[in-house]
C-alpha cells in the first residue's frame, strides 16, 4: 500500500492520476462510460435525422415532442425506476432498463420502420391541419408520424435514464470523494472520445455499408439497420461491464484488496439494508433540500438554454439538408467535432482547472461559454435580418449557410463544455450528500428536472409559434428568455459554490474522524482536488 500512496510524477499527475490498485475499478468504469456515450451519440444523430429531415415542419416539431412526448415519458420512466428500486437490486434495475431500451431500438429498425405509412395517422393529420393554426404544424407532424416520435422519445430517455441516472449512479456509488476529482475528468474524456468514434462511424455508414441487408426498404433504412446493430452490440458490452463492476464492489471488501478502501463491510451492509424510498418520494426529497433545489435550477437553466439555441440552429440546418442520409452525415460530423473539442478540454483544462480553482469556477464556465457563443450566433441572425452580410459575401457563403455554420460552432462549444465542465461539476455536487438525497434526488433531477427545462423552452416556443407561425419571427422573445435563464444560472452557481465548500469540508472532517489511520498516512502529502480553495485543507486525497 505504501507504494500506492506515493505522489505521481508531474506528467502522470496531469494526464493519468490513477493508482495501479484502482485499475480494476477504474478501467471497467471508463469502458462503461465509453459504450454508454457511444450509444448516446449514435441515437442523437439518428433521432434528429429520422424526425427532422424532409419534414414539412422542420425543427418546429421539436418543441411539441419535448412537451407531449418526452415529459410524459420521463415521468413514467422515473416512476418505473422508483418502483423497481423499491423491490429489486441495483443490478437488476440497471440490466432491466438497459435491456428494455435495446429491445425497442431493435424492434423499430427491424419491424416498425419497414411498415412505413401503414402505421402512420395520415387521415387524422389531415383533419388536424384544418382545425389547428399554422403554427401548430409541428404538433400535426408529431401525431402523424407517431412511430418516429416514439423513437425520438426513447432516444432522448437513453440520455436521462442510462447515461445520467444509471451510469452516473453506479459511478457515484463506487467512487469516493478522494477518487472523484481524478476519476471523473478521465471518465468524461472517455465519453468525449466515444462521441468522436460514434460520429465518424455514423458518417462512414452514410457513404458505405457495414453489413448489407436485404431487409432495407430504402437507403436510410440500410443506414438505420447498421447503426442499430452497433447500438445493440455496444449494449451487450454495457451489461457485461456493469455486472463486472457490480461483482467487484461486492467482493472487494471481503478480499481486502483495497478497491473499496473507503467503505467498510459494515457500511456496505448498512447500505444494502437502507430502506428504499417510494417512487412518489423522489421529488419530495428534492423539494426538501435547498442544496438539491440549487442543483435542479442549474440543470433546468442549462436544458432551457440549450433547447432555445438548438431549435433555432436546427431550423437553419433543415433548410439546407432534406435527405435523411445527408442530414445524418452533417449531424455526425458535428458530433465528432463536439467530441474532439470536449476531449481536448477534458485532457488539458477541465480536471486541472477544477482542482486548481475549485468547483465554482468550473461550474461558471458553461453558462459563460453559452452566453458568448450564443451571442455570436444570434448576432449573425439579426445581421441577416438587417442585410448586414458583408462577411458572408466575402467568404462566399450564403446567409443561410453562414448562420447555420455559426450555429454549429455554438452547438459544438456548448455541448463540449457540457460534457466536460457541466457534467463533471454537476456530478461532483452530489457527492457530499447523504445516500438517500444522492440516489433519489439525482434520479428526480436527471429524470424529470432536465426534461422540464427543455419543456420550458418548448412551451415558450409553442406559444410563440401559435402567435407568429415561424421560428424566425420569434427571435426577439427567444433572446429575452435566454438572457434571463443564463443570468439566473450564474447567480445560483455562485450560491451553490459556497454550499459545496461547506459540505465538502464537513464531509472531509467526518471521513478523517472515521478513518484516522488513512488520514495520518495521506494528509501530509496532498489536499482535495475537488473542494473549493478555502476548503482544500479539510479533505484528504490520494493524488
UniProtKB/Swiss-Prot annotation:
Membrane topology: Multi-pass membrane protein
Main localization (coarse): membrane
UniProt xrefs under InterPro entries: ADP_ATP_car_bac_type (IPR004667), MFS_trans_sf (IPR036259)
Entry superkingdom: Bacteria
Keyword Cytoplasm: no
Region Disordered: start-end pairs: 510-543
One Gene Ontology CC term in the entry: plasma membrane
Compositional bias per record (Basic and acidic residues), positions renumbered to this chain: 533-543
SUPFAM superfamilies, A to Z: MFS general substrate transporter
Listed GO MF terms: ATP binding; ATP:ADP antiporter activity
Localization in the cell: Cell membrane
Keywords, ordered alphabetically: ATP-binding, Cell membrane, Membrane, Nucleotide-binding, Transmembrane, Transmembrane helix, Transport
Transmembrane segment boundaries: 23-43, 61-81, 92-112, 150-170, 185-205, 222-242, 292-312, 334-354, 361-381, 389-409, 452-472, 477-497
Family note: Belongs to the ADP/ATP translocase tlc family.
PANTHER family: ADP,ATP CARRIER PROTEIN 1, PTHR31187
Protein name from the UniProt record: ADP,ATP carrier protein 2
